[in-house]
């Protein structure tokens, strides 16, 4: 049983265990112990939140104290660290980020030498060393740290290289929202160097404003800019660049389900698709129906890009993602990458000569409503008898024409309640009913 690692690394509020300088020092040392056995080089990147600089120094100190070398790349998107870990032949990559969360949170995510998430076994080995006394190697064996100055340029060229040489984005006006996060100095350049007219927002990070007013979780500012600029497309990335949400020319926000539909169908129409698509338990039932009508296989994974990746590898498929905007194109990259996913959508638009909304004809989504309930004590909803009964009641009401999902968040102290069906009123009623039932369980647990 892992003590610190959750479904997406280690995450929490800055200054609260384990997101403290003391813990990061020890974590760096523990990681150094694990990864120096293969190669002494560990890559460290971060997003733009102010605490990242503090934790970068702590991790660096711990790693070199264990006798491993460090390569520092500064603020870079999470998928860029996955790519750079591979190209620098590092034994591991570390990202300091809390993704779409506010600046008051931070976290740590590890990548393997191949650019994928590290295994549960490696996480357990790191946790083993976290419980051991920290011992510094002899002075002659202390690791060395170097800063990589051309990391951004390397990643920009990699992203551009995934777009066909014969295609240009000339004539397209695109608003790019970087959430004042890690993509602020790379995403606008990728799209402009491919020929697009780019209007950039969310590109002035100050350490405190990451994800605050814009980005993939707050697309309203992007929507307003797309309409005001009469742009062809709006691209919203989250703070670490692994999520993508789009806004079409009419100001309609398009999520990860829409993106999967566009990419999969374009691959199918151009003869480059095989296998199926992996979604999650949160993927809209309408997406599943649309794929079945076009002969595209569909499989659901647990929520989290880690589980999407695992399911893709199980099936031998290459495309998967989540409604939240994590899109994995395994034929191109090893992890969710917002810029790469946006380029795949743009390729479909250019090659088919269609606007974003025109590429979505054929996808009819079921009404879906999601509510989050903050809890003091985490619990598994499906193991509670009261909630088991409530789920059964809701499913009976839907009569096979919808879905009910209650689950605990893997990264925050939340219980998520989701209902989808063909009728908005029924969906609203059932969500309120289930929220009331969850709150009764939460209250009962608070009294014990």
UniProtKB/Swiss-Prot annotation:
Keywords assigned by UniProt, alphabetized: Isomerase, Magnesium, Metal-binding, Phosphoprotein
Classification of source organism: Bacteria, Pseudomonadati, Pseudomonadota, Gammaproteobacteria, Oceanospirillales
Broad enzyme group: isomerase
GO molecular function, one term: magnesium ion binding
Pfam family, one: PGM_PMM_II
Active site: 99
EC code: 5.4.2.10
Manner of cofactor binding, per the entry note: Binds 1 Mg(2+) ion per subunit.
Named cofactor requirement(s): Mg(2+)
Record Gene3D superfamilies: Alpha-D-Glucose-1,6-Bisphosphate, subunit A, domain 3 (3.40.120.10), Alpha-D-phosphohexomutase, C-terminal domain (3.30.310.50)
Listed name of the protein: Phosphoglucosamine mutase
The species this protein was found in: Marinomonas sp. (strain MWYL1)
Annotated residues for binding of Mg(2+): 99, 238, 240, 242
Phosphoserine PTM positions: 99
Post-translational modification: Activated by phosphorylation.
UniProt record, GO biological process: carbohydrate metabolic process; peptidoglycan biosynthetic process; UDP-N-acetylglucosamine biosynthetic process
Task of the protein: Catalyzes the conversion of glucosamine-6-phosphate to glucosamine-1-phosphate.
Catalytic reactions on record: alpha-D-glucosamine 1-phosphate = D-glucosamine 6-phosphate
Assigned protein family: Belongs to the phosphohexose mutase family.
Membrane-spanning ranges: none
Domain of life, per lineage: Bacteria
Gene Ontology CC terms: cytosol
